[in-house]
């Protein structure tokens, strides 16, 4: 039987683009681990993706995961859009390159053999874990230590 893990994620950006951060909480039974990091220049969507990626990459074995995010971009991207993006060689229906393709590919790889249920939670609505992730993300964004290598400013 697969381990049942809960993951909660959030991303934050002080300006968009601007300094950003992500926060994630992973829970297995009574054990909890938090993740966060801040980047000097990035976007909110990239930080939302990073939160999910980092938490999923931390799983050491195949798990059954409920991943809660307040990002419709992440949830819809992974449940509705990614299949066609991959079929089209990471292009949108308009034949344009998928934005944040580096992170979508990394998230796709991080899914591995996990059984994942993607849940959307309303942000800033009192959901305790989402509020904690938001605090982690905002604190990390306030003290960025890393460069977001894949960030490409819009031209």
Swiss-Prot record:
Residues annotated to bind Mg(2+) 2: 10, 134
GO molecular function, one term: nucleic acid binding
SUPFAM superfamilies: Ribonuclease H-like (SSF53098)
Enzyme class: hydrolase
Reaction(s) this enzyme catalyzes, per UniProt: Endonucleolytic cleavage to 5'-phosphomonoester
Keyword Hydrolase: yes
Family annotation (Gene3D superfamilies): Ribonuclease H-like superfamily/Ribonuclease H
Compartments, record wording: Cytoplasm
A Pfam family: RNase_H
Sites where the protein binds Mg(2+) 1: 10, 48, 70
EC numbers, comma separated: 3.1.26.4
Cofactor: Mg(2+)
Principal subcellular localisation of the protein: cytoplasm
Record's subunit section: Monomer.
Role this protein plays: Endonuclease that specifically degrades the RNA of RNA-DNA hybrids.
NCBIfam families found in the cross-reference section: PRK00203.1 (NF001236)
Protein name: Ribonuclease H
Originating species: Klebsiella pneumoniae (strain 342)
Originating gene: rnhA
């Amino acid at each position: 039987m697969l381990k049942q893990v809960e993951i909660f994620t959030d991303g934050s950006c002080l300006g968009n683009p601007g300094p950003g951060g992500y926060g994630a909480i992973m829970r297995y039974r009574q054990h909890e681990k938090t993740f966060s990091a801040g980047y000097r220049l990035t976007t909110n969507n990239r930080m939302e993706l990073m939160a999910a990626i980092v938490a999923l990459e931390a799983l050491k074995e195949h798990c059954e995961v409920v991943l809660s995010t307040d990002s419709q971009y992440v949830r819809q991207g992974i449940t509705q859009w990614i299949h066609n993006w991959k079929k089209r060689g990471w292009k949108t229906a308009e034949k344009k390159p998928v934005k944040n393709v580096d992170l979508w590919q990394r998230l796709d790889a991080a899914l591995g053999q996990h059984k994942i249920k993607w849940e959307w939670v309303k942000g800033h609505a009192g959901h305790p874990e989402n509020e904690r992730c938001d605090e982690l993300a905002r604190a990390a964004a306030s003290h960025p230590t890393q460069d977001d290598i894949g960030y490409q400013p819009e031209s």
